[in-house]
Amino acid sequence: MPNVAETERSNDSGNGEHKSERKSPEENLQGAVKSFCTSASGAPLGPKGDGHYPWSCPVTHTREKIYAICSDYAFLNQATSIYKTPNPSRSPCLPDSTSLSAGNNSSRYIGIPTSTSEIIYNEENSLENLSNSLGKLPLAWEIDKSEFDGVTTNSKHKSGNAKKQVSKRKTSDKKGRYQKECPQHSPLEDIKQRKVLDLRRWYCISRPQYKTSCGISSLISCWNFLYSTMGAGNLPPITQEEALHILGFQPPFEDIRFGPFTGNTTLMRWFRQINDHFHVKGCSYVLYKPHGKNKTAGETASGALSKLTRGLKDESLAYIYHCQNHYFCPIGFEATPVKANKAFSRGPLSPQEVEYWILIGESSRKHPAIHCKKWADIVTDLNTQNPEYLDIRHLERGLQYRKTKKVGGNLHCIIAFQRLNWQRFGLWNFPFGTIRQESQPPTHAQGIAKSESEDNISKKQHGRLGRSFSASFHQDSAWKKMSSIHERRNSGYQGYSDYDGND
């Protein structure tokens, strides 16, 4: 790096004027100098032989900061020049032994070589510590680059913020595009599909029941859900007593033994009779009955489960489960994942990944209001055959055996009841052939002997039990075809009655 001071000293001795034609690098730097130390403005520089000061003084803090720009090739090691004013006053910042010798026409720039070793300046040190360690060393000024750093930092921040905003915008665009293409799927919807319980079904359970009246109590529970305002209909709800009165029974209802004449076909017939009374439409059928008379041939357990779970989500369907000596109403289900990490999994699970539990509303006050039974246990109950049976309400007893000589068959099943709309046309809407009308009014049913079953009840006695036929809907052959279950009590069961008087 050229010695600027020597060059300027030679020019001053020759003509006493500043260079006008040829500009040195220091003159180009003069416009960049914005402030200087007023305390060192005009003091004479004490000569040390050649007027040069070694670049060995550290950078110190002063009240006024002077700016200097270093050349590219010596930016980290040395400053190019320091602005010097022509004020001849002594600098109070310098030691007493140090003076600035300058003539009237002296140069404004003093070169500073880098011959001696540098003293590293730690910016964390205080000014007092620095003044003690400096001693008599010449003074140098701090090269303040804060404005330049601020500019670069701001530009970096601006560019960084712009990049972040662009990336955020791209991310949001991607998310928006993904949400448009694949709408957000909530796990709650999947849970709702796996855990189904319509509280209206539970509200409609007629509880408690009369002794052995579980059949009519379950039927009224289904009817109220399908047709009354307590469930999914628009009619006033009815009670067991009102239904029994419609069916032709007279009080005291506690004395009626419903067991001997209440069967699957009886419940379906009563359902139609109550519908005729209120001028509403509906149908009933056996959903799943793997064994016995009028079994659902070809229906599998998985197929029945699929229909049952779909039906429990449908407010136009209700169910009655006929188990050991009892009727009650399925009202919901839960598909429980087999693995714990699938508890809140999204999307449907395969049948192999879940096990189904059926929620069953109980009409008897002697049992819990809601049973929760495995579908596998229900299938076991429906698939047992006489003399073997399984009491679904007492699974702790395991498989049991009846005392009977007859082998095979099972009355247990699941019956479906469906509400039909007036706009729907089906077999129920059309009269076929000769219309049969009931000529005898229904009378009290208590005169029937306990030992009589549906096999032995004559048509005349059916009339006394409250059976009636709608003149606008049915003919004998059509009724037999639609009911599909002219199943009789104790048919194929010698010495076995499905009711023992327990509720």
Swiss-Prot record:
The keyword Nucleus applies. Widely expressed. Expressed at higher level in spleen, ovary, small intestine, colon, peripheral blood leukocytes and liver. Also expressed in testis, ovary, aorta, appendix, trachea, pituitary gland, bladder, uterus, spinal cord, salivary gland, stomach, mammary gland and bone marrow. Weakly or not expressed in fetal spleen, adult thymus and certain cancer cell lines. Residues 155-172 have a biased composition (Basic residues). This is Basic immunoglobulin-like variable motif-containing protein. Residues 1-26, 173-184 have a biased composition (Basic and acidic residues). Belongs to the BIVM family. Residues 1-33, 152-184, 438-469 are annotated as: Disordered. It is found in: Cytoplasm; Nucleus. Keywords: Cytoplasm, Nucleus. The keyword Protease does not apply. The lineage of its organism: Eukaryota, Metazoa, Chordata, Craniata, Vertebrata. One of its GO terms (cellular component) is nucleus. GO terms for molecular function: DNA endonuclease activity; single-stranded DNA binding.
